[in-house]
UniProtKB/Swiss-Prot annotation:
Belongs to the protein sulfotransferase family. SUPFAM superfamilies: P-loop containing nucleoside triphosphate hydrolases. Glycans are attached at N36, N115. InterPro entries: P-loop_NTPase, TPST-like. It is an enzyme of class 2 (transferase). It comes from Caenorhabditis elegans. The gene is tpst-2. Disulfide bonds join C13-C68, C137-C144. GO terms for molecular function: protein-tyrosine sulfotransferase activity. It comes from the Eukaryota. Catalyzes the O-sulfation of tyrosine residues within acidic motifs of polypeptides, using 3'-phosphoadenylyl sulfate (PAPS) as cosubstrate. The lineage of its organism: Eukaryota, Metazoa, Ecdysozoa, Nematoda, Chromadorea. This is Putative protein-tyrosine sulfotransferase.
Amino acid sequence: MRAILDAHPDVRCGGETMLLPSFLTWQAGWRNDWVNNSGITQEVFDDAVSAFITEIVAKHSELAPRLCNKDPYTALWLPTIRRLYPNAKFILMIRDARAVVHSMIERKVPVAGYNTSDEISMFVQWNQELRKMTFQCNNAPGQCIKVYYERLIQKPAEEILRITNFLDLPFSQQMLRHQDLIGDEVDLNDQEFSASQVKNSINTKALTSWFDCFSEETLRKLDDVAPFLGILGYDTSISKPDYSTFADDDFYQFKNFYS
């Protein structure tokens, strides 16, 4: 998603800062220590936090009319970021937890709270965090949009148009060929764990990359350890689900508040 946005001539996201998720966690602790005990008001603290974030986002790559940032799990801090940037808009990317967990394990991605040697605990963690992020996104109407990975790669033109409309951006054909703009419009941070994937064109191969990678015992437990999968519309009844329903024209008509 980040590379697709970066391909737009009016947008610059740049590579993952790999700093802001930790900073957002730290500032929560600082608020308790300083705002409550030293006379520093929330407004003053917010100004300081937003100034730091703005400097990082604005200056870690070239300027553009519209700036964006993509760092894993920053959506967990959506209420705070909305307060700091009341005119900002947010995209919550949603993907099948089985693909997410497989990707973390396969690429050895270090994400706080995820123990890659314990698959079940990873699904539990995903369930908790996605539920929280989805709830927070749903409570930011007009500011936050949910985008399903499985729909984006099957209906890229339609979904990208939906996204640009939400962001009040003109549609750009360049967004459909972000891979051709790597190193030009699209900058990569070689330390990003997703760098190798970003270099690929939009394709459906990743949909089934997790097939045959989990034991039947693990898959049978999903409804208990990650029930939010079903709420989001993912089929947990079979080991190799068909994602074609995510490409249906009426896909969004059957989405409830939680999904």
